Curated annotation (Swiss-Prot):
SUPFAM superfamilies: IlvD/EDD N-terminal domain-like, LeuD/IlvD-like. It comes from Bordetella parapertussis (strain 12822 / ATCC BAA-587 / NCTC 13253). Its cofactor is [2Fe-2S] cluster; Mg(2+). This is Dihydroxy-acid dehydratase 2. Belongs to the IlvD/Edd family.
Length: 561
């Protein structure tokens, strides 16, 4: 099979003379048409620090493609900043962006018959959006993560974006003066790169490396370091070789490799968003995978990394301690990874990890051996019960109060809940319910970092529960339960909760329960009426119409299921 197996459809033959004429205008020569066309999906943007450092990575990839005797074809992908849109109407566009990016890359690469694609992304939804596109198309591809941000510093402490969100709660409670508040705001994010803890972007990049779709060590590099540029160039070279070998994403993205990815997510204490996104990636790759698979893996994989938001360290600390290869080697030796999975380099996981030490380096406590794991089981639990028969997601490790039964404080939007929190109307023992924020109801399934961080800042993070049909940021921690499905907008049980109802969150029993009789639940369901959609035009209306339930990834192309 030729290197230009796809692009020859628009570059070969008499009938394609007009097509070639367009390429000549771009500086191509006749000899170039014999070489593969490699797309570079460049997420560079000055909207957010997560993506502001991507251009030099794209430039390195472009040059490496040329040196590898292939033709780079550069196109842009959009982004928004989750950190900037958080707590506002703009956050409704965040999950929408995942689908838009997947559609953009698929449209450009398929429309132009590209032979391979290098995806370069930074902020949270760049990650699954790009991977979904590669999995859908099954065109040789590689993911180049833009890299993590370095931590900020103030008064001897490492800072991340979550430090600022939590400072809001502390400041409003009078626990922090204005000088410290402003200093944290100004020092938390010192440069370019994605948010520094094991939040969503770093979680997904680590998982992509574990799955074999990104190069070893690349997921924990800092954006500003030169090794990140070198890694982008090497990624492009590896991709061109994958095109020549016809090594495709679906050769790599399998049920076994997704199990590897989820095992690493559990071991590193990753984001709840990974559940939603890997349901979507598996759907795109046509890999059988469901929400219960996460619980199956959680029960056998311990947490061996001490990373923010619930731990002490950030991604650059993990990198210095050996990065994802070190985590994977520990899991592989414990029989918790599939060593025979192929990776984008053509090597298996076991071959890739052959020279990685069996034990983490001494003198650090970022990565622990299995026998000294921070928690014996993973942290991302799937809860079920009469409030979420399809399942929901909670971080359950490190909770001082793993069971809470309390009165429901019911809010039909994040904005109403945030107002109540800032007005100090939430008390110890309450269970905050934020509903009509699901994929269809929001629409867009906003992340609830602002209210959860405000609760933490007010000292209520361990004593107040929060459940929502929306999502949580990778920076969220505490007694919080998200992705409740079915969502309120389609008549899910969360829509039937009334102010003051007794609600139980039980991390031990993996239970989310509304403590009323079946008869009362049935009566409320009969009386419930679906509200009108909040949007009837534009991209949010389209997403609300097309998105499926969160328990299946909230994808917009699940028409046949």
């Amino acid at each position: 099979m030729s290197d230009n197996n796809r692009s020859r459809h628009i570059t070969e033959g008499v009938a394609r003379a007009p097509n070639r004429a367009m390429y000549y205008a771009l500086g191509y020569t006749e000899a170039d048409f014999q070489n593969p066309m490699i797309g570079v999906a460049n997420g560079h943007s000055t909207i957010t620090p997560c993506n502001s450092g991507l251009q030099r990575l794209a430039d390195a990839a472009i040059e490496a493609i040329r040196v590898s005797r292939a033709n780079p074809q550069v196109f842009g992908t959009p982004t928004i900043s989750d950190g900037m849109s958080m707590g506002t109407e703009g956050m409704k566009y965040s999950l929408v962006l995942r689908e838009v990016i997947a559609d953009c890359i698929e449209t450009a690469a398929q429309g132009q018959w590209m032979d391979g694609v290098v995806v370069i992304g930074g902020c949270d939804k760049n990650m699954p959006g790009g991977m979904m596109a590669l999995a859908r198309m099954n065109v040789p591809g590689i993911y180049v993560y833009g890299g993590t941000i370095k931590p900020g510093h103030y008064k001897g402490k490492d800072l991340t974006i979550v430090s600022v969100f939590e400072a809001v709660g502390e400041y409003t409670m009078g626990r922090m003066d204005e000088t410290d508040f402003k200093a944290i705001e100004q020092c938390a994010i010192p440069g370019s790169g994605s948010c520094g803890g094991m939040y969503t972007a770093n979680t997904m990049s680590s998982a992509f490396e574990a799955m074999g779709m990104s190069l070893p060590h690349s997921s924990t590099m800092a954006n500003e370091d030169q090794e990140k540029v070198a890694s982008a160039a090497e990624s492009a070279r590896v991709l061109v070789e994958a095109v020549r070998r016809q090594l495709r994403p679906r050769d790599i993205i399998t049920r076994a490799s997704i199990e590897n990815a989820v095992a690493v997510i559990m071991a590193t204490g990753g984001s709840t968003n990974a559940v939603l996104h890997f349901l979507a990636i598996a759907h795109a790759a046509e890999v059988p995978w469901n929400i219960d698979d996460f619980e199956r893996i959680r029960k056998r994989v311990p947490v061996i990394c001490d990373l923010k938001p619930s731990g002490k360290y950030v991604a650059t600390d993990l990198h210095r301690a050996g990065g994802i290869p070190q985590v994977m080697k520990i899991l592989l030796n414990a029989g918790l990874l599939h060593g025979d999975c192929i990776t984008i380099t053509g090597k298996t996981v076991a071959e890739t990890l052959a020279n990685v030490p069996d034990a983490p380096p001494p003198g650090q406590d970022v990565i622990m051996p299995i026998e000294r794991a921070f928690y014996p089981q993973g942290h991302l639990a799937i809860l079920k019960g009469n409030l979420s028969p399809e399942g929901c997601v909670a971080k359950i490790t490190g909770l001082k109060n793993p069971v809470i039964t309390g009165p429901a404080r019911v809010f039909d939007s994040e904005d109403d809940a945030m107002s109540a929190i800032m007005d100090r109307r939430i008390r110890d023992g309450d269970v905050v319910v934020i509903r009509y924020e699901g994929p269809k109801g929001g629409p867009g399934m906003r992340e609830m970092l602002a209210p959860t961080s405000a609760l933490v800042g007010q000292g209520l993070g361990e004593t107040v529960g929060l459940i929502t049909d929306g999502r949580f940021s990778g920076g969220t921690w505490g007694m919080v339960v998200g992705h409740v499905a079915p969502e309120a907008f389609v008549g899910g049980p969360i829509a039937l909760i009334r102010e003051g109802d007794s609600v139980t969150i039980d991390a031990h029993q993996l239970l989310l329960q509304l403590n009323i009789s079946d008869e009362e639940m049935a009566a409320r369901r009969k009386a419930w009426a679906q509200p009108k959609p909040r949007y009837v035009r534009g991209v949010l209306a389209k997403f609300g119409k097309l998105a499926c339930t969160a328990s299946r990834g909230a994808v917009t192309d699940a028409f046949e299921e």
